[in-house]
Amino acid sequence: MSDHDQIQAVARAAALAGGAELRARYRDGDTEAEYGAHDVKAAADVAAESRMLPVVRGAFPDHAVFAEEAGEFAGDGPYRWIIDPLDGTNDFAAGLPTFASSVAVLRDGEPLVAAVHQPATGETYVARAGEGVRYDGDRVAAADARGAGGAEGDVAGATVAVIVGRDVPRDATLAAEADALRAALGDRVKRVLDSWAPTVHSGLLARGRLQGLVQFHPDEEEQAVTELLASEAGAAVRRDEDLYVAATDEATLAELWSTLEDADR
């Protein structure tokens, strides 16, 4: 087994370990949480992370790690792990099944491996640079279900997820810009999905169930996963500073990008 094979296996195992904790709490109705004006923190975040960290640290004690709850662990070498024990905390606390445990691994700052496990549905995505995306073990691509959105570039029937970073609602100017982006998309596509679980909806894009994904000031915990799932699934992507767009094909990307450029912000 190569180093990258082992990293991929450990990332998947860590995501599954966190997911097992979340699944047990979700089924028991244990969604205890502290609610703020713009965010929510569930006890399950800490519990799931406590299951994930030993998997990673036990296998690679010298690697740098950022865990959403525990913070930074210094390390040597080119690898850095990003652990998000509960992506979609608001949905989890509300009893919605759209949440996941995710792990990303960067090599020299670039996404190398991503693993996402959705406990409520038992779905697992694993992506690796140069190796594509696997959904429950099978290779998938963003173009697999293109017909759901019509012909290439025909976004009138498209479903597009919009993801904003945690700082956006706290800043009136950024919040207004995000609203303008949503409004512009709403006038152009069939459905704008306001995503509170970026890794879940990134997986849907990776297998063509969504036609587009828009991220505005994305959070680090999810962005590495999103980028790797999109690129390895063959999605068309474009970034300009704090705006990132991925789509099932180049024509759809061009239409979405043009729509966002014309937004009143």
What do these predicted ranges mean?
Residues 132-135, 139-141, 251-255:
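Short helix-loop capping/hinge motifs at secondary-structure junctions, enriched
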Residues 1-86, 261-265:
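N-terminal subdomain of lithium-sensitive/metallo-dependent phosphomonoesterases centered on the IMPase/IPPase/PAP
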Residues 46, 69, 85-88, 92, ...:
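Generic detector of well-ordered alpha-helical packing
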Residues 75-137:
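DPxDG-like acidic metal-binding loop motif
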Residues 148-265:
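An extended, acidic
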Residues 22, 45, 56, 89, ...:
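Residue-level signal for inorganic ion chemistry
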Residues 24, 28, 141-142, 165-168:
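Acidic/histidine-rich helix-loop elements
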Residues 33, 73-75, 108, 152-154, ...:
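Solvent-exposed alpha-helices and their adjacent loops that cap or buttress functional pockets
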